[in-house]
Design a protein with these regions (language model features):
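Short N-terminal signal/transit or membrane-insertion segments
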Residues: 1-14, 54-77, 200-208
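N-terminal capping/interface segment
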Residues: 1-44
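A conserved beta-strand-loop-helix scaffold within acyl/acetyltransferase catalytic domains
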Residues: 27-133, 137-139
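Short, flexible loop/turn elements at secondary-structure junctions
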Residues: 72-76, 87-89, 138-145, 179-181, ...
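Acyl-donor binding region in acyl/amide transferases
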Residues: 97-204
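Long, compositionally biased interface segments
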Residues: 175, 179-253
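Long, low-complexity, intrinsically disordered segments
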Residues: 249-266
Length: 266
């Protein structure tokens, strides 16, 4: 993941309020590109299904050159948030063609009896999304009931962190994610920052639906408009402090930004 030092400083400055708010919610954020570590962290979540193959180093080639992840931990050091993004080179290839070829890496594990004969269809945008494309997945934030991070706006803030870094590092033509229908119906794409949400589904050889996933996406101009707006803030946040940045060897490569929680304000 390549980023000029000046761009990296601008990014951290833009996000310092977001990091401060998350600190006040009791969330320590870690960002990295070691997907063996991500796989290890993800395996701790026994209440979730298997990691998606697109982000699993045992199934896909993914490293600091084409991906990074964001994780969140509570004051006890427990993992309460995950998300990841992967850069795809779809030059001359539509997202529709890509999903047909690599469908096994996007199908929810265990959702269909025959992944070889299951395909995604529906959204017209599948034909127009091409070029430098990012896939945003593995988004999860632990539900903590009323007064928890979700109700305080953490979903939008965590997504904003990933999108800011993604644009700063790669400036993609498009970004997309696949969201279960039950979440799309609740407007999840809006909390993630996306403004396009198209109905889609996975169909088996008999054209029977095995899973209903909405395609949420943004083009470069949508991303620019989103990032031009100030990030959503936690209303109770009062103190703003810049995030601690751990500079790896060989700048301008940025492979770890760590926010250290100073006080847990619940």
């Amino acid at each position: 993941m390549q980023m000029l030092p000046s761009k990296l400083f601008e990014l951290i400055t833009n996000l310092r309020g977001v990091f401060s708010d998350l600190e006040q919610m009791g969330i320590r954020v870690e960002i990295g590109d070691d997907f063996a570590k991500f796989r290890s962290l993800r395996s701790q979540l026994s209440n979730r299904g298997p990691i998606y193959p697109m982000f699993d180093v045992a199934s896909s080639y993914i490293d600091q050159g084409n991906g990074f992840w964001v994780c969140g931990f509570n004051p006890d050091g427990e993992l309460i948030h995950t998300q990841a993004v992967r850069l795809l080179d779809l030059d001359g290839v539509s997202l529709d063609q890509h999903l047909k070829t690599h469908r096994h890496k996007y199908i929810t594990p265990g959702s269909t009896p025959d992944p070889d004969l299951t395909f995604y269809s529906g959204p017209e945008a599948l034909q127009t999304i091409t070029g430098k494309v990012c896939y945003h997945g593995e988004f999860w934030l632990h539900a903590s009931g009323l007064g928890g991070p979700r109700s305080q706006g953490a979903t939008s803030m965590l997504s904003r962190i990933l999108l800011e870094i993604m644009v700063g590092a790669w400036n993609p033509s498009f970004v997309f994610a696949l969201v279960p229908q039950r979440l799309a119906a609740k407007g999840a794409h809006l909390r993630y920052g996306y403004n396009h949400c198209d109905h889609g589904s996975w169909l088996d050889a008999n054209q029977q639906m095995t899973e209903e996933d909405h395609l949420i996406w943004m083009a470069a101009n949508d991303l620019a408009n989103l990032l031009a707006r100030k990030p959503q803030r936690f209303q109770c946040a009062k103190n703003v402090s810049i995030a601690q940045f751990t500079k790896p060897a060989g700048m301008p490569k940025a492979n770890c930004i760590s926010v250290k929680k100073q006080e847990a304000i619940m």
